[in-house]
Amino acid sequence: MTDVPPEIIEHYTEEVDEGERIAAGFSQLELLRVQEVVRRHLPAGSLRVLDVGGGTGIHAQWLAADGHSVHVVDPVPRHVQQAPNLGGVTSELGDARQLSANDDSVDVVLLFGPLYHLSEGEDRVRALREAMRVVRPDGLVFVAAVSKFASLFDGLARGLLFEPGFPEIVERDLREGEHRNPDRLPHRFTTAHFHHPDALRAEISAAGLDVVDLVGVEGLAGWLPHLADRWDDPEARQLILYSARAVEAEPSLLGLSAHLLAVARRRPASGTAPPASAARTPTSRR
């Protein structure tokens, strides 16, 4: 099953290089914040990680460097060809809704992409249930989503709101959570579903997973003008990170972030106690 809309495949094949995007410029904030949230929750030791929708392996790379065994599953052939070039990473062509992995076969699943490229709610819940199937009891599932308010804030921050056709995109995002790019302009992203924070939590719960944490990744800092330039200044970078961390769990401000990151856990097998690693208190957000 790889019936992904062709415009999504074309976007990641012909219009953008996802690895370069997230490793450069203002996306450095997104990358570093995802790293620290994931590392905060991971138990000690070498883990088996399934990176579903892992793209070119941008997250698989640092996880492998941390000593974990990482396998990328992605529906874009270009990504599957690129990911194995990273040390310690394997890959396969596949779909989040029908994974080839065996039941209970991994310690951690990343869903960084599938939920915002599956427009139907049933498909998103199906992907979450597949993640729950392949992760071991008490294992973790990390779920990324795009905030339904992202286009509005991006439009204001970068002046896109004043481009012909962009206000209509924003209106649909806010009304339905369905993002479309009829003019196929690369800077307007591609076909996607954008989440309200409450809806993301509800979908994860509907799949049978327990939500452990839900954070805003970038906060208002993600919309800072000239963020890429300020990021090069070490002192400014720490202030930017502080501003994101300070409000990451504030419910009234979650939607201000471009990206949401949920941490979910598969319930332990009936009659068994969680392992000691699962009972660890996550390190401080500060």
Q: Residue locations for each model-derived region?
A:
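Conserved class I S-adenosyl-L-methionine
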Residues: 1-45, 58, 62, 82, 140-173
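Class I SAM-dependent methyltransferase SAM/SAH-binding core
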Residues: 50, 57-98
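A short SAM/SAH-binding and catalytic strip from SAM-dependent methyltransferases
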Residues: 107-122
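Acceptor-substrate binding/catalytic loop of class I
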Residues: 118, 184-198
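A short glycine-rich, Lys/Arg-flanked "PGG" loop and its adjoining helix->strand segment in the class I
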Residues: 125-137
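C-terminal lobe and adjacent flexible extensions of AdoMet/dcAdoMet transferase-like proteins
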Residues: 203, 207-286
